[in-house]
């Protein structure tokens, strides 16, 4: 990855994923692994729906990544199954979305936060409401983190 980044001048941010299960076993769907934290990637994308599906500790992950965090996919998940990546609106699952957003803002994160919520089952009005709710959630918690930031 480092060579590709250097040669292209692009930032390649590898995303955290989750283990795939088949029957009682797991399938190695991602190489070298679904968890980018111990890998030597310079830049990582963190998806909170994926931390739910993987049953990973999102706050431990963001602390471990530190300055390697380059991009965020903001969503939530229940973590009730490792078979379904839910992409719930933030605040509707079991992930610490509020704490996560406040932490990255307070820490000086300068990358993008992209909403990645599932709206396929919604009509236009429902979709707009879910997106507005998610955007307000993100803005509120990023602002709270910024307010605590040391000048």
Task: Label every model-predicted segment.
Residues 1-2, 11:
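Hydrophobic, well-ordered secondary-structure segments
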Residues 2, 6, 105:
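Anion (oxyanion) recognition and catalysis
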Residues 8-10, 111:
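Residue-level signal for beta-strand positions within conserved beta-sheet cores that form or flank
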Residues 10-23, 46:
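Aromatic-lined carbohydrate-recognition surfaces of secreted/lumenal glycan-active proteins
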Residues 24-151:
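Histidine-acidic metal/acid-base catalytic patches
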């Amino acid at each position: 990855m480092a060579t590709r980044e250097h040669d292209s001048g692009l930032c390649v941010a590898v995303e955290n994923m989750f283990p795939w299960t088949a029957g009682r076993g797991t399938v190695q769907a991602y190489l070298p692994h679904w968890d980018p934290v111990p890998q030597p990637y310079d830049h990582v994308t963190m998806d909170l729906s994926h931390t739910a599906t993987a049953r990973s500790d999102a706050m431990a992950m963001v602390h471990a990544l530190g300055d390697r965090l380059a991009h965020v996919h903001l969503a939530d998940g229940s973590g009730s199954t490792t078979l379904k990546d839910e992409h719930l609106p933030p605040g509707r699952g079991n992930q610490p979305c509020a704490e996560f957003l406040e932490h990255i803002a307070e820490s000086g994160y300068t990358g993008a936060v992209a909403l990645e919520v599932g709206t396929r089952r919604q009509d236009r009005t429902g979709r707009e409401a879910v997106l507005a709710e998610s955007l307000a959630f993100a803005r509120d918690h990023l602002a709270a983190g910024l307010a605590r930031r040391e000048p």
